[in-house]
Amino acid sequence: MKYDNLLDRFIKYVKVNTRSDPDSETTPSTESQEVFALTILKPEMEAIGLQDVHYNPVNGYLIGTLPANNPTLTRKIGFIAHMDTADFNAENVNPQIIDNYQGGDITLGSSNYKLDPEAFPNLNNYIGQTLITTDGTTLLGADDKSGIAEIMTAIEFLTSQPQIEHCDIKVAFGPDEEIGVGADKFEVADFEVDFAYTMDGGPLGELQYETFSAAALEVTFLGRNVHPGTAKDQMINALQLAIDFHEKLPAKERPEYTDGYQGFYHLTGLTGTVEEARASYIIRDFEEASFEARKVKVENIAQSMNAHLGTKRVLVELNDQYYNMKKVIEKDMTAIELAKEVMEELAIKPVIEPIRGGTDGSKISFMGIPTPNIFAGGENMHGRFEFVSLQTMERAVDVIIGLVCKA
């Protein structure tokens, strides 16, 4: 094992349930994230040599600093990872360790689930490696506790090898990335760096500086309920209005039909009765013009339906969530060029593709700190089929060390 504590550290982290809560109005959205920060991460950060380690109860960020040990390395670089996990069972995470994976099915604990190369051909990329999987009852939490473990391990390596020269390093572990609000209260003044990286990507080599632009759409449908036996020309079924609205959106512009730079409309929730219904969507696109056009389209559909109904029964609420960080980062590609150079020196092929999602870096970039995303190793994230390669995590640690030594 290249880094002695990496695996144990990761296993310790994922066993803590830090699932975020989209319905919470607190920061962090769940108390468990704060407990994780204060009782596990903070003491460990101090023990491995980070200085000025402090937790901000207003925004839920835990921050530490490792000062440069060579004054000629003048850049200041930050590394960021999120503490929360996605909206899937995270209680009693019981990881499996598969040494020297030789292909074939991996049975997930005593559950009826398995990782099957036919269903998940990405498994074939990991022959001979050590894989960490779930037991089939929870997610794993590699998104993004692999990132936290990698950052911690890199810092521990640097402080244990003081002869290795490095620049100023800032570390931040934040809450609620999975529910899209993690960076809302991020304080740039408390994280003075030239640029940063989120360690929140997937397979080996990922280096990303393009994200979706994102909006949340809530549509309320107001019906009129009368007895179905006498409903002719009187009833207005709110659920049917919701169906009609959905059918007016382009059927092929859904997540299951799109990839690459294609955007989409995604229905994430539908509840209601004849009297009132509510549909929740997310809207995603890369180009600003296309993103704005999607929002205009849903407004126009609502207006058209209301005109046909003769009254306002379709109510639209749109809220932008984050924007494509390419707009910021492409103005100064230093962070990308440095990461490419380090990866290539480590014989890692940079895989530069758009993120069909978002990271905390999306918002932080628009706050003035260019923050692209680097691989952390997770595969099949957000569910029971999630796994991560220990060797990919080790390579992520290599990249972090390479970045701060080359700055």
Curated annotation (Swiss-Prot):
One of its GO terms (molecular function) is metallopeptidase activity. CDD domains: M20_peptT. Belongs to the peptidase M20B family. It is found in: Cytoplasm. GO terms for biological process: peptide catabolic process; proteolysis. Cleaves the N-terminal amino acid of tripeptides. Gene3D superfamilies: 3.30.70.360, Zn peptidases (3.40.630.10). It comes from Streptococcus pyogenes serotype M49 (strain NZ131). Zn(2+) 2 binds at D143, E178, H382. Zn(2+) 1 binds at H82, D143, D200. It comes from the Bacteria. This is Peptidase T. SUPFAM superfamilies: Bacterial exopeptidase dimerisation domain, Zn-dependent exopeptidases. It catalyses: Release of the N-terminal residue from a tripeptide. The keyword Ribosomal protein does not apply. The active site is at D84, E177. Keywords: Aminopeptidase, Cytoplasm, Hydrolase, Metal-binding, Metalloprotease, Protease, Zinc. Its cofactor is Zn(2+). It is an enzyme of class 3 (hydrolase). PANTHER family: PEPTIDASE T (PTHR42994:SF1). Binds 2 Zn(2+) ions per subunit. Its main location: cytoplasm.
